[in-house]
């Protein structure tokens, strides 16, 4: 029985209702149907686009209005169909055949078009479908089928899969057609265009209630229908007048593979997106019937078609079409179904599109009968089956009706009676089961699932057959039994799947693990979700893809990079019923991992410290985990960063027995196996138990050894000497002589002793030490010091390796300070040795041993790599790379040394292997690659007999070592390998090595190898942050930035030009940073304060114009806790206290004046809180959050408070140096890492300075202290290198001298020569600065002996010192010496400075002129010798503020120049009341005389004669043997002290007016003495006048009586020096005496005066023996007529001076003067046997006599010296009548008269002299004893002056 649901529409079709055509045609069409419907194309992840091609002629006017005349552009998500319209361009000739007409006629002949009209309840009819019946088949078409379609071009139709946003392809080029545009339909609103019967279009939307639905075909067994009948159930159409949908379909499951039938399924809105499930049809053996469910209004009978039985199960295949997601796909081709078809109807409302569910009906037990069709009047209605009564009659067989007897009863013929027999039989029948369908909302729509398997029942019937003639004529049922069937229960799916969505609801960055956690919201109402993947993109690149195991759980994506912009997307896989489909969800999220934490990136060592017995000490191991870690902290050391002090959070025991120490600082992390983790942890070993003779504790070891010095002791663990506290006077850990054995290995493992502060042993006596490492030594002592022992006798040391720093005031060595008959083998030292001795006592410094002696001593197979500093200054002090002093048969063999030796004193007894082998030291098979500076690469002793063999080097040194063979590096390496040295430091400390780490930024993700330098520099700019951040900022450094190419040494925060060290107090004022590069340049970057980091102890600054940041390398703190602890202690320290003197090593009553720190000490103490903050900020990265750190640092300062104050004061006093606007005091005092030395501690260095002792801290030792204490931490070898390095950085465009001169407060005059060639040299000095007048260049020269001047000059607080520099001298003087009274006022302040400056300028010019003259006189070799630096001190005879003159001592604090310069320099000398000045050959000291006075300048030339005569003025010939130094100065080469002086000497200083009537010397000496020829010309002219006047005076006196002669003249004679060794007279002295009457009687002529050795009484003594080497002068106008000589040796003082000038005038400087005054002929004299014993030299020397000189100079020209002199007088007397006239101001008797007298003749001149002599005779005693009283003397001066003026200083002759 058929049921119809309420509102259900049914379409019934009946062949009888077709009003046009033949039934046969209609029927046959079902078998021949071949017209295909457009196939369903697959949906995919991309946008499906349909291209449908059609001709323009098919468009209506309305359609043409929708035409877009353009090409399709970009694909949009809403696109559906493009109708591509073409215009035909082909016009074929008319052949009488019209294809359209032909097609129509052909189609009309083979087809029948049936219009299906729907009748509505309101009586209206509408066209529903076209039923096209053809001979090839049937096609049910919707009314809209003829809309936008064209069969002409349909072959080109296509479906495209185009990504949204991609370009659509251009339409095809079709031959004969022109593309003109397109019409587009969209799918976003599911609107479809349909053309109604009247040609109008209407839009239909799925969302509207009247939208058209298509039908699903469902197969089921139905016992209600007879075999061969079928039922087609189609979902009815909703009511409404809307146009027909373009999409329409009918069921196609009954089509064969040859009867392709396409069906489109339109989905219920309630199930849109769900997959349609096509049930699998089981194999059926029974016919299948099709049932049509009809509506009340529209019924059409349908026919059934018999098909062969289908053997295979049915299932739904195919992809989905747009708009039908979730529906079952229509399979286009199916195999031929061979069974009858049964079509189930569709379900009622709410179940559209679903398989019909048949209600369960009772089993049908009656016979089946086939009903015919309905009778007229019942068309379209179901056949009514009348109830049939039970048949009780015998069964009769009816035949089939014959033709033309249809409907008539069959004619039964009568048959004869037959015999009837019976037969019993049993018939078993199957009772078919029924199928019950249950809707399952969890099962995909149209899918079926057998919930319960059906089972057929059985019916057993017993029959009795009646047989007649062998035929059964009747059968009678005897019995019947039944087994009921089990009904089959089938679940039918109603689920229509929709595409699930996965939305990212949350993204959490887990930055420490480089990962993210993503949370999702999966919306999957229909369980279509299959899987999903999280995809991470960097730009367009997929970098990470992770399967989402459970969308409900958080998804972790790891392995990401920091500072990379990422996008996270979700790639979804789902299934809507058929195949898996994929797409990328629209829910995305951008993110970037940014990680900024504090990380300790590089660790060389990590040390645990804790408090024990009221002191902090280091722990190498722990016996248990402490419960309270407040008193513990950690030191982290690195060569790349400052040492860090960090608090301990916890200490716990690990499972392996070690202890885990956790360091906690806010934001501190370390990298683990899966990313970063909080805090930093390291391990500490567990302490081992002690065993007899085996030790694991240093304290127990020392205690045991001290109790038994002859025992055997073995180490079983690494240990630290920090366990033991030493007494103040303790110089070693063990006292006494150790005779036992110390073994550093237990046989399986070697161990080390750490942290020695003193030598382990005092003495090793026959002891053995082997297999031991001694590490991190930090020993300092005022006694002999070494790591292992102070002394060793007959000891054996093997396989001992030492590493650390050792310093001392006496002998210093790596292993043993002093050894005798000791063997040291296979051992090594690595580190620093500092010998800071300040005296001249014996000491030796060596890398292995200081001094080793004895034939049994051997140093074999040792290695040294060390920096050694020494103050070796004499033969008692040595330094060597391996041994300082090697003597008495001791041997060094098979050993190698590398490193550097710095000798602050420049003494050369320093060697790369050994300082000295004197005597009998032996060296064999050694290699030295040591930079020895002023020493030698192998041995400091270079005597040829030294026993040094097979010594090699591959480096170059300043000095050539006679024993060194130069080899290549490869050769050196091979030689060292052959030595077989196996000692190593690497075999111990394994537990500590586990805590080491290093970073290589180039190995990190996103790092670029070529940016290695940039990463290193960014590390400097932000040292605390994690390495990934370093790489991130490093990648932002421009390739043009210097940070990209050049390595940084340090970064210094600044405020303008001020270095900022107190960062906490000035953090907001920091506005730039200084970048110090390794190429010795600096650059500056502007910065602005950005913020405090999360850990507020780290602060950040933005760098202007850059993408990176800056953070100072300091945990910013005000250090309140520490300062509160120590401030009062520091403020109570006094400089002169006993405690301070104890630290200095000075006696309680010792004065500390020579420190010159008084003023600065008080200034530092007054501001100690600020200084302390600077020290702590720059010292280490001190984190003050831990109590242990605060207490440790506080105790360290308090325990060393005196040393701390001394060191801090010292640095503030001597390093307060300016470089233009830049003051470097803070940089020098606190920034010890400025040169990249990150291992240096500011606090430790300052304390070490204070502890270095009084001698080291003396102001005069600033150069030595730098070399010993600061060079290694500052990175420059000398203090000069240090200040020059700063100059190069901060004033690169200035020279050292320019900077020095600008920044010292001393008044400096550098007087360059007026000689062009000299000035050129001085202005362009050579590399050795030989010609430079720059004060800095000169005091920094290697030859300068007063280098301690540097820092006092640079730090002078005021102008109180002057410096005058010229070609040969460097003069220093104090302003206080010239505090004169001017106009009754004692000069001070600016007036004094102006006064002194003026005098300095004048004196400097005079000194310059003096040396210019000498430069002009000398040969080229001697000229070069003038370029030197002889120090001149102006003395300490100063005046105080009251004008009182006194000799100041260096402790005088009232004289600024003493306190600030002369005192600190340490250059002082005692007062000498009898000395104006003195010299010693290399310096000049003024005492009574003042350098800047006019007379003082003359004295200056006097002293410089002493410093220059022998080697320079005498051109290397030396002084003539037998003549003292003073003969060469006063009265010979010393400049006159005035141009008015009557002394026979040269004016080399003063300039005067040319027409000065009083001058007696040249008015411009530089111009006049511009060559030796000019000098001779001048002197010859001078002697022309003097000889003439002397002859006239002789004539005037010889005319007098003998009494006058006797008073006027004196006789000069020789006395002799007796050579007692050779028993002979040698050198002469002069004496004068009065004449006897007999002698006077012989004086009758000029020649008689010469022959009788007569001199004038005037200007000489009446009677005197002139001591040799005296201060004498010769008067130009008091004649010496004598020609006295000495044939036995050198002449006396008077005659020497007189004859020297006469030779200068006659023969010149080189041909007359030098041969006479110098030892030019000494070699010749000595060779000839003329010699004498010199007590000065202690040997025989040449005896150069006057006779030899005379012979050599005159070469036979004269017969004697007297003959020479007579000739000189005669030469002038012969020309006197040719004298040029002169005019003088002269009036006898009136000395001040201006009366002019013109002298025109010699006679007139003679007359004037006669008159003057007569005047003197009247007052003869006075006139001859007091030169100014002599009128002759005055007249001669006036005549001489007149000729001097008229001849232009004798440039012209006095003769006509």
UniProtKB/Swiss-Prot annotation:
The organism's place on the tree of life at top rank: Bacteria
Pentaglycyl murein peptidoglycan amidated threonine: residues bearing it: 95
Residues binding Zn(2+): 1502, 1506, 1526
Record-listed E.C. numbers: 3.4.24.-
TM helices/strands, residue ranges: 97-117, 130-152
Biased composition (Basic and acidic residues): 322-334, 351-361
Subcellular localization(s) per the UniProt record: Secreted, Cell wall; Membrane
Record membrane topology: Multi-pass membrane protein; Peptidoglycan-anchor
Database matches in Pfam families: G5, Glug, Peptidase_M26_C, Peptidase_M26_N, YSIRK_signal
Region (Disordered): 254-362
Domain G5: start-end pairs: 417-496
Active site: 1503
Proregion positions: 43-95
Keywords: Cell wall, Hydrolase, Membrane, Metal-binding, Metalloprotease, Peptidoglycan-anchor, Protease, Secreted, Signal, Transmembrane, Transmembrane helix, Virulence, Zinc
Listed Gene3D superfamilies: 2.160.20.110, Resuscitation-promoting factor rpfb
Any GO BP: proteolysis
GO cellular component: extracellular region; membrane
Post-translational note: The Gram-positive cell-wall anchor motif LPXTG is located in the N-terminal part, in contrast to such motifs in other known streptococcal and staphylococcal proteins. The protease could be cleaved by the sortase and anchored in the membrane via the two potential N-terminal transmembrane domains, whereas the propeptide located prior to the LPXTG motif would remain attached to the cell wall peptidoglycan by an amide bond.
Signal sequence bounds: 1-42
Role summary: Zinc metalloproteinase that specifically cleaves human matrix metalloproteinase 9 (MMP-9), leading to its activation. May play a role in pneumococcal virulence and pathogenicity in the lung.
Family, similarity comment: Belongs to the peptidase M26 family.
Protein's name according to its UniProt entry: Zinc metalloprotease ZmpC
Organism the protein comes from: Streptococcus pneumoniae serotype 4 (strain ATCC BAA-334 / TIGR4)
């Amino acid at each position: 029985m058929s049921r119809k649901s309420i509102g259900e529409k049914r379409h019934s079709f009946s062949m009888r209702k077709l009003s046009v055509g033949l039934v046969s045609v209609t029927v046959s069409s079902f078998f021949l149907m071949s017209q295909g419907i457009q196939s369903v194309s697959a949906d995919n992840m991309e946008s499906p686009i349909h291209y449908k091609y059609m001709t323009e002629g098919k468009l209506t006017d309305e359609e043409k209005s929708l035409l877009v005349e353009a090409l399709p552009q970009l694909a949009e998500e809403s696109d559906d169909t493009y109708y591509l319209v073409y215009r035909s361009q082909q016009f074929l000739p008319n052949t009488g055949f019209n294809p359209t007409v032909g097609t129509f006629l052909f189609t009309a002949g083979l087809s029948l078009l049936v219009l299906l009209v729907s009748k509505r309840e309101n009586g209206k009819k509408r066209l529903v479908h076209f039923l096209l019946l053809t001979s090839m088949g049937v096609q049910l078409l919707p009314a809209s089928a003829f809309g936008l379609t064209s069969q002409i071009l349909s072959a080109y139709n296509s479906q495209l899969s185009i990504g949204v946003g991609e370009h659509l392809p251009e339409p095809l080029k079709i031959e004969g057609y022109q593309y003109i545009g397109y019409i587009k339909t969209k799918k976003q609103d599911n609107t479809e265009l349909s053309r109604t019967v009247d040609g109008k279009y209407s839009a239909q939307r799925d969302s509207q209630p009247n939208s058209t639905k298509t039908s699903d075909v469902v197969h089921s067994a139905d016992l209600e229908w007879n075999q061969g009948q079928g039922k087609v159930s189609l979902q009815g159409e909703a009511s409404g007048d809307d146009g027909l949908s373009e999409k329409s379909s009918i069921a196609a499951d009954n089509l064969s593979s040859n009867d392709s039938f396409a069906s489109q399924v339109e989905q219920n809105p309630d199930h849109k997106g769900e997959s349609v499930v096509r049930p699998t049809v089981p194999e059926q053996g029974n016919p299948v019937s099709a049932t049509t469910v009809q509506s009340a209004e529209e019924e059409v009978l349908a026919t059934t078609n018999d098909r062969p039985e289908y053997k295979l199960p049915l299932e739904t295949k195919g992809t989905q079409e747009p708009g039908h997601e979730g529906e079952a796909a229509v399979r286009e081709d199916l195999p031929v179904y061979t069974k009858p078809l049964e079509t189930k109807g569709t379900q009622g409302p709410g179940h559209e599109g679903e398989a019909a569910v048949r209600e369960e009906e009772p089993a049908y037990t009656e016979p089946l009968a086939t009903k015919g069709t309905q009778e007229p009047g019942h068309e379209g209605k179901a056949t009514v089956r009348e109830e049939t009564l039970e048949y009780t009659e015998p069964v009769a067989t009816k035949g089939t009706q014959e033709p033309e007897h249809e409907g008539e009863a069959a004619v039964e013929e009568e048959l004869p009676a037959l015999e009837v027999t019976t037969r019993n039989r049993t018939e078993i029948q199957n009772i078919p089961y029924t199928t019950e369908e249950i809707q399952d909302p969890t099962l995909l729509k149209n899918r079926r699932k057998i919930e319960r398997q059906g089972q057929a029942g059985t019916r057993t019937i017993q029959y009795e057959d009646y047989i007649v003639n062998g035929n059964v004529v009747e059968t009678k049922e005897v019995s019947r039994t039944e087994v009921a069937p089990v009904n089959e229960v089938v679940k039918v799916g109603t689920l229509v799947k929709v595409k699930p969505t996965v939305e990212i609801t949350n993204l959490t960055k887990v930055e420490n693990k480089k990962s993210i956690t993503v949370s999702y919201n999966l919306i999957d109402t229909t369980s279509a979700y299959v899987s999903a993947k999280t995809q991470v993109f960097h730009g367009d690149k997929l970098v990470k893809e992770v399967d989402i195991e459970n969308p409900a759980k958080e998804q972790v994506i790891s392995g990401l990079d920091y500072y990379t912009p990422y996008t996270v997307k979700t790639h979804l896989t789902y299934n809507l019923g058929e195949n898996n489909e994929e797409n990328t969800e629209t829910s995305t999220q951008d993110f970037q991992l940014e990680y900024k934490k504090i990380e300790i990136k590089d660790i060389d060592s990590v040390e645990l410290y804790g408090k024990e017995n009221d002191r902090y000490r280091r722990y190498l191991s722990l016996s248990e985990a402490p419960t309270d870690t407040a008193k513990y902290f950690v030191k982290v050391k690195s060569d790349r960063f400052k040492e860090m002090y960090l608090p301990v959070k916890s200490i716990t025991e690990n499972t392996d027995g070690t202890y885990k120490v956790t360091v906690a600082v806010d934001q501190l992390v370390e990298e683990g196996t899966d990313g970063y983790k909080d805090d930093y942890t390291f391990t500490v070993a567990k302490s081992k138990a002690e065993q007899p003779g085996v030790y694991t504790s240093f304290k127990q070891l020392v205690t045991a050894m001290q109790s038994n010095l002859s025992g055997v002791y073995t180490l079983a663990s690494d240990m630290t000497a920090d366990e033991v506290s030493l007494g103040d006077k303790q110089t070693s850990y063990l006292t006494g002589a150790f005779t036992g054995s110390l073994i550093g290995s237990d046989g399986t493992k070697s161990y080390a002793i750490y942290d020695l502060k003193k030598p382990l042993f005092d003495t090793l006596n026959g002891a053995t030490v082997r297999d031991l490492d001694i590490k991190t030594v930090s020993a300092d002592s005022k006694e002999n010091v070494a790591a292992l022992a102070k002394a060793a006798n007959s000891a054996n040391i093997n396989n001992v390796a030492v590493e650390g720093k050792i310093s001392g005031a006496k002998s210093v060595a790596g292993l043993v300070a002093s050894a005798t008959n000791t063997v040291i083998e296979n051992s090594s030292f690595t580190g620093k040795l500092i010998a800071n001795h300040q005296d001249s006592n014996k000491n030796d410094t060596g890398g292995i041993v200081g001094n080793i002696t004895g034939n049994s001593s051997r140093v074999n197979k040792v290695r040294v790599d060390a920096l050694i500093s020494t103050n070796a200054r004499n033969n008692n002090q040595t330094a060597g790379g391996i041994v300082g002093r090697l003597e008495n048969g001791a041997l060094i063999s098979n050993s190698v040394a590398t490193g550097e030796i710095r000798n602050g004193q420049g003494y050369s007894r320093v060697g790369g292997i050994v300082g000295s082998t004197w005597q009998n030291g032996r060296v064999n098979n050694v290699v030295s690659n040591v930079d020895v500076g002023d020493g030698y690469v192998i041995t400091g002793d270079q005597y040829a007999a030294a026993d040094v063999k097979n010594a090699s080097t591959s480096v170059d040194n300043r000095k050539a070592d006679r024993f060194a063979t130069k080899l290549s590096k490869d050769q050196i390496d091979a030689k060292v390998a052959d030595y077989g040295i196996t000692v190593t430091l690497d075999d111990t400390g394994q537990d500590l090595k586990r805590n080491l780490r290093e970073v290589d930024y180039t190995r990190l993700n996103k790092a670029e190898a070529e940016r290695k330098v940039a990463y290193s520099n960014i590390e400097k700019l932000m040292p605390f942050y994690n390495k990934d951040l370093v790489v991130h900022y490093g990648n932002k450094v421009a390739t043009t930035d210097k940070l990209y190419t050049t390595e940084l040494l340090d970064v210094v925060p600044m405020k303008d030009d001020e270095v900022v060290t107190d960062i906490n107090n000035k953090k907001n004022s920091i506005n730039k940073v200084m970048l110090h590069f390794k190429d010795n340049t600096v650059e500056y970057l502007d910065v602005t304060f950005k913020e405090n980091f999360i850990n507020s102890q780290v602060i950040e600054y933005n760098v202007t114009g850059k993408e990176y940041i800056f953070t100072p390398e300091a945990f910013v703190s005000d250090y309140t806790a520490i300062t509160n602890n120590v401030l009062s202690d520091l403020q109570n320290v006094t400089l002169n206290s006993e405690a301070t003197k104890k630290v200095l090593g000075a006696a309680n009553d010792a004065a500390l004046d020579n420190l010159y720190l008084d003023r600065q000490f008080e200034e530092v103490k007054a501001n100690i809180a600020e200084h302390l903050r600077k020290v702590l900020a720059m010292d280490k990265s001190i984190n003050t959050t831990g109590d242990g750190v605060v207490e440790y640092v506080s105790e360290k300062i308090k325990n060393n408070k005196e040393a701390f104050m001394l060191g801090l004061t010292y640095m503030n006093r001597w390093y307060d140096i300016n470089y233009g606007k830049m003051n470097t005091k803070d940089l020098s005092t606190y920034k010890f890492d400025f040169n990249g030395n990150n291992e240096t501690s500011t606090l430790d260095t300052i304390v070490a300075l204070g502890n270095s002792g009084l001698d080291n801290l003396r102001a005069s030792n600033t150069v030595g202290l730098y070399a010993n204490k600061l060079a290694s931490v500052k990175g420059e070898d000398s203090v000069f290198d240090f200040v020059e390095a700063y100059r190069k950085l901060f004033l690169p465009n200035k020279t050292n001298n320019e900077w020095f001169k600008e920044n010292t407060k001393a008044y400096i005059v550098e007087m360059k020569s007026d000689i062009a060639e000299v000035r050129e040299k001085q202005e362009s000095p050579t590399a050795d600065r030989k010609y430079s007048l720059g004060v800095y260049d000169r005091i920094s020269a290697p030859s300068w002996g007063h280098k301690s001047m540097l820092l006092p000059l640079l730090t002078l607080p005021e102008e109180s010192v002057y410096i005058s520099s010229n070609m040969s001298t460097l003069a220093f003087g104090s302003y206080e010496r010239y505090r004169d009274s001017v106009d009754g006022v004692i000069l001070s302040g600016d007036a004094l400075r102006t006064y002194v400056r003026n005098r300095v300028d004048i004196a400097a010019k005079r000194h310059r002129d003096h040396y210019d003259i000498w430069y002009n006189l000398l040969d080229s070799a001697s000229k070069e010798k003038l370029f030197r630096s002889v120090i001149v001190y102006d003395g300490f005879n100063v005046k105080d503020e009251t004008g009182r003159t006194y000799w100041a001592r260096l402790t005088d604090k009232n004289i600024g120049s003493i306190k600030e310069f002369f005192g600190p320099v340490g250059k002082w000398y005692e007062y000498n009341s009898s000395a104006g000045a003195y010299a010693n050959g290399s310096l000049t000291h003024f005492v009574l005389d003042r350098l800047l006075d006019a007379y003082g300048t003359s004295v200056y030339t006097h002293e410089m004669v002493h410093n220059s005569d022998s080697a320079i003025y005498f051109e290397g010939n030396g002084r003539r043997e037998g003549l003292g130094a003073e003969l060469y100065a006063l009265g010979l080469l010393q400049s006159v002290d005035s141009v008015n002086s009557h002394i026979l000497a040269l004016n080399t200083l003063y300039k005067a007016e040319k027409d000065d009537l009083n001058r007696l010397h040249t008015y411009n000496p530089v111009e006049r003495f511009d060559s030796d020829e000019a000098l001779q010309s001048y002197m010859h002219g001078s002697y022309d006048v003097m000889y003439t006047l002397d002859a006239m005076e002789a004539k005037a006196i010889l005319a007098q009586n003998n009494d006058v002669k006797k008073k006027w003249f004196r006789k000069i004679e020789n006395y002799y020096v007796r050579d007692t060794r050779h028993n002979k007279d040698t050198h002469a002295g002069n004496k004068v005496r009065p004449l006897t009457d007999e002698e006077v009687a012989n004086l009758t002529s000029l020649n008689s005066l010469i022959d009788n050795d007569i001199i004038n009484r005037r200007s000489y003594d009446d009677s005197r023996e002139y001591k040799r080497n005296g201060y004498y002068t010769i008067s130009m106008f008091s004649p010496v007529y004598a020609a006295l000589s000495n044939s036995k040796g050198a002449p006396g003082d008077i005659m020497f001076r007189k004859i020297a000038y006469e030779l200068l005038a006659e023969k010149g400087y080189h041909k007359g003067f030098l041969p006479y005054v110098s030892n030019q002929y000494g070699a010749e004299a000595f060779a000839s046997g003329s010699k004498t014993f010199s007590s000065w030299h202690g040997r025989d020397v040449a005896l150069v006599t006057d006779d030899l000189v005379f012979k050599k100079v005159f070469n036979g020209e004269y017969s004697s010296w007297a003959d020479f002199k007579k000739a000189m007088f005669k030469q002038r007397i012969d020309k006197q009548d040719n004298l040029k006239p002169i005019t003088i101001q002269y009036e006898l008797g009136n000395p001040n008269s201006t009366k002019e007298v013109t002298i025109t003749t010699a006679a007139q001149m003679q007359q004037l002299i006669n008159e003057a002599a007569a005047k003197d005779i009247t007052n003869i005693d006075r006139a001859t004893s007091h030169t100014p009283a002599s009128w002759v003397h005055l007249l001669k001066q006036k005549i001489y002056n007149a000729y001097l003026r008229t001849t232009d200083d004798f440039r012209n002759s006095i003769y006509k």
